[in-house]
Amino acid sequence: MFRQSKTIITKLTNLSFQGSWRSRGSSAVEKALKYTVGQKIHNFTVKEVTAVPDLFLTAVKLSHDATGAQYLHAARDDSNNLFSVLFRTTPMDSTGVPHILEHTVLCGSQRFPCRDPFFKMLNRSLSTFMNAFTASDYTMYPFSTQNAKDFQNLLSVYLDAVFFPCLRELDFWQEGWRLEHENPTDPSSPLVFKGVVFNEMKGVFSDNERLYAQHLQNKLLPDHTYSVVSGGEPLAIPELTWEQLKHFHATHYHPSNARFFTYGDLPLEQHLQQIEEEAMSKFERTEPNTAVPPQTPWDKPRMDHVSCRPDALAPDPVKQNTLCMSFLLGDITDTFEMFTLSLLSSLMMSGPNSPFYKALIEPKIGSDFSSSAGFDGSTRQASFTIGLQGMAEDDTETVKHIIAQTIDDIIASGFEEEQIEALLHKIEIQMKHQSTSFGLALASYIASLWNHDGDPVQLLKISESVSRFRQCLKENPRYLQEKVQHYFKNNTHQLTLSMSPDERFLEKQAEAEEQKLQQKIQILSSEDRKDIYEKGLQLLAVQSTTQDASCLPALKVSDIEPIIPYTPVQPGAAGGVPVQYCEQPTNGMVYFRAMSNINSLPEDLKIYVPLFCSVITKMGSGMLDYRQQAQRIELKTGGLSVSPQIIPDTEDLDLYEQGIILSSSCLERNLPDMFQLWSDLFNSPRFDDEERLRVLVMMSAQELSNGISYSGHMYAMTRAARSLTPTADLQESFSGMDQVKFMKRIAEMTDLTSILRKLPRIKRHLFNPENMRCALNATPQKMPDVAAEVERFIGNIAGNRKERKPVRPSVVERALGPEAGAAATRKLISEAHFKPCQMKTYFQLPFNVNFVSECVRTVPFTHADYASLCILGRMMTAKFLHGEIREKGGAYGGGARMGGGGLFSFYSYRDPNSTQTLSAFRGGVEWARAGKFTQQDIDEAKLSVFSAVDAPVAPSDKGLGRFLNGITDEMKQAHRERLFAVTERNLIDVAGRYLGIGQQTCGVAILGPENESIRKDPSWVVK
């Protein structure tokens, strides 16, 4: 997977920390503290042992005696153990060699020579995460699992893959690039470029924001590895040879150039022994020549320009330009300076109280900040970028002037103390909040700094940095202003990069690709052509052969826990509103949710619900204007959010609950403040500021438009499903292409008064305690206080309570659970007369890849066949569709899955094909109906399904399934038993009965470039 350099990797405020989950007599944390500096363990030497109480862990730093490999172990009482190995990969061209290598090492190794052990292990393990990332200057291979045996299995596969890969030429052709006949079996069909990474990168550069971010980095840091595209520039990829790939592996994938990281409660000695025996003992030290030198600073600012494709869904078609100024900062190994600059970046541009928000967003010059804006600590020297997307070309000079003026204003005025406190409170919340994938977050958080020989342990001492930051401010009130003066005002290493759409952009890309193709073809001899044809057949034969994977380790179905852990909840009520209390070790946090149905909302207002949800917490309430409200939310909570929720019934596909969910969290001490903020939103929301609404509408429309090229498969699945169930129909309105186009129309309106007037009407129906139920997760000690505060909150909002008739008369009541009491019911809408119908929709978009989906209406969650369809989807993906769609078809991804709403969905992602992929979906059904699978295939599919079913759940989210969907632990256990019981006969039966042609109604949708054959086919609706 190509990971673009962005703040996701190192930005502190993106890391959700996780508190101690379990108490033990002798915990992993305590045991690790007993290691001593200089201690030898399996040819590793302990260099440092550090308690990190902020994160409830002990950090043990080691180095390997023979190779010098660096090792960090984070011992913590968390059963979701993680391993990661990182190599510094610094390419000097844009052929994508580190990215193609990342794909190819996972295609088979010395001990595990079968093709594609990585994808095969997804189905032979209970992993909670398995992947690999190529960043600008490193490649990382992480996995996590809760099962100790599984950890050892995966560690063996990962170590062998990275250090002893086969790197077969056939795998290079498949994963990287190749010249091949369009139809490999027909030598008269034209020669074309194929390859998984080749198509993936074409898809990446279909996304204007990704394109811009890539150029920004290349041009800001032009001296060394950051001047090239590590993921591969599509037209440079065909310059890479197999020999160059093997050479890059030999020079970069060595323990002397590696950083190992392990996390969790498994014993460190065990990891070290296995790593030493299976990999390290076979190597000697080398001197890797992979360091990135500092960029030579410029003596004057530079400007540059880049072109992109037009955006058919842009909120304002005449405002499609992007302009940013990017400043090169200091070395990321200076952890405290980077901590300060990361906070400074947030103060400068996060939220409506920040100076750049006021200066750039509120005047409505652009639709939003560029997604490249902010602090980026993923390269050796960090950078800060500020600028806009969705702006007019004429405003270029204005924006430059505003940025310069705002920097001057910050130097003159600084920041309010309350803004700084709000930001430090955010850090405190994130240190308390518990995520389920903390090991992975930690591995990503330290990756860039450690990659450049910084101290990863220092980076984890967050409280120390906060204290030092406070001290610096105390000693020098102009501390931050002086940083702004130094890094922004006086910094000559700054780049101004503009981007504008070119109507012929995709056409020019296609022409350039054709030109590159012809260059390659023209130099081919008749021998070469014959060779290409034969190699194409050879690859196809290998792809079509069932692989013997018996060399790979695997868990057995008997390794899966037969019984789920029970989550106790206490039902109650506050002021007549049902409340679910769930006592959990939340580490001093309180989590609040409320579900409110929208059954009484008039039909004409329904399409506005997502807009209402996105603006209601951002327009002010009570005595607070929107700026004061934002400040208060930051100071007292982990955020307030409102989002639409459509929940299918577990027994009937024509029943569903429609509503909104309110979510927030806070530190225990701020509980009254959090509920006061909600009370103000219920009692006195502000709907009087049209200018504020316009800003929010533009940002929302831009975000939706930007998201399509990244999440195209989700939009395709949502659209394909819309005509199959009432739930899916409403889902398309709320979160599909219908909503994207609706928001574009609103963004184009010159007068939003009519929209503004609708918001109070919607609020009366949505913020009605009569339709509400609440859920709270907190520590047992705090729960009495929580109950009292909820009671007070419901009392405060009682004036909004009104019994309103549902718009649709057919309402079915379902109890929330056996012990919830008569009052606690969910009011579901019944559409018994809904008629599913066949529909094929094509969205023509300026992309150069497709997103394809087909959906079939099947059965609800509690139906006896639901479990079989879950197993079938996973098995079909691993054993048939992966080979057809990715290996042969060249798409980045694809598969099939069973959804909770009773829909069986096929999909492909960044796919060079369109209707051919629909044929592959059908082929998958025929493969299953013919029973062309083994008991081993079924067992592997079960392991894969259970790894998702048993994924860790954070204390903040325990009991949510029951609260939202009415799915009790008993129902989960029954589903579990049905999954265990699935047989070959069941799978053949459900494939024929539900997925066979003509058996059930299906819907199809494709998002992709212009397609002449579909346009001429009357069975398709072209949008």
Curated annotation (Swiss-Prot):
- InterPro entries given in the database record: Metalloenz_LuxS/M16, Pept_M16_N, Peptidase_M16_C, Peptidase_M16C_assoc, PreP_C
Please indicate which superkingdom the organism of origin belongs to. Eukaryota
Localization per Swiss-Prot or TrEMBL: Mitochondrion matrix
In the Enzyme Commission scheme, what number(s) does this protein have? Answer: 3.4.24.-
Broad class of where this protein is predominantly found: mitochondrion
| Xref: SUPFAM superfamilies | LuxS/MPP-like metallohydrolase
GO BP annotations of the record are: protein processing; proteolysis
Annotated Gene Ontology MF terms?
Answer: metal ion binding; metalloendopeptidase activity
Q: Which key words tag this protein in UniProt?
A: Disulfide bond, Hydrolase, Metal-binding, Metalloprotease, Mitochondrion, Protease, Transit peptide, Zinc
State whether keyword Transmembrane helix applies. no
Q: Quote the record's cofactor note.
A: Binds 1 zinc ion per subunit.
The answer to whether keyword Isomerase applies is no
So which cofactors does this thing need?
A: Zn(2+)
Disulfide bonds listed in the record: 114-551
Summarizing the function annotation, the protein's role is:
Metalloendopeptidase of the mitochondrial matrix that functions in peptide cleavage and degradation rather than in protein processing. Has an ATP-independent activity. Specifically cleaves peptides in the range of 5 to 65 residues. Shows a preference for cleavage after small polar residues and before basic residues, but without any positional preference. Degrades the transit peptides of mitochondrial proteins after their cleavage. Also degrades other unstructured peptides.
Record note on quaternary structure: Monomer and homodimer; homodimerization is induced by binding of the substrate.
The name this protein carries in UniProt is Presequence protease, mitochondrial
